[in-house]
Design a protein with these regions (language model features):
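Intrinsically disordered, low-complexity, charged/polar segments
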Residues: 43-67
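Short connector loops at helix/strand junctions that flank enzyme active sites
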Residues: 13-15, 31
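Short low-complexity stretches enriched in small and charged residues
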Residues: 1-2, 19
Length: 67
């Protein structure tokens, strides 16, 4: 499993580049969430930490650490 760290940059399997800006907790479930920003567009997203290192279609990681 790869490192998940604030400030690190990752490539999504569909090609976009994102930077992790925070690790948060869901207000109802306490589930850890990754808060990340699209480097090019500036959009901010959140995704459960449990999904970050998932293997998706074609057997590739959802996100790959690039920096």
């Amino acid at each position: 499993m790869q490192e998940i760290s604030i400030g690190k940059t990752y490539k999504h399997y569909k090609g976009n580049i994102y930077k992790i800006i925070a690790i948060a907790k869901h207000s109802e479930s306490d589930e850890e969430m990754i808060v990340y920003q699209n480097i090019e567009k500036g959009d901010i997203w959140t995704r459960p930490k449990s999904m970050w290192n998932e293997v998706v279609k074609g057997g590739v990681l959802r996100f790959t650490l690039i920096d």
